[in-house]
Amino acid sequence: MLNVLFFAQPRELIGEDSIQLEGDFATAEAVREHLAQKGDRWALALEKGKLLVAINQTLMPLESAVKNGDEIAFFPPVTGG
């Protein structure tokens, strides 16, 4: 099982801050694609190219491998000012 967290705009669009996800996913991108198929709000919240991912609290590329028990966090790019 994966623990999937959502922050900022993805959290607001989806209406959830976290979910438990069962299944066999090879990469964070596979998780993103699976969740984006849950509906229009999910697809908008998890739009490729507008999202960063952290696996076990480390910023990683979407193509990074995931395994059972991992924590995956999706969030928009952070800007400063």
Where are these regions (language model features)?
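Ubiquitin-like/PB1-type beta-grasp interaction modules and other compact soluble beta-rich domains
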Residues: 1-79
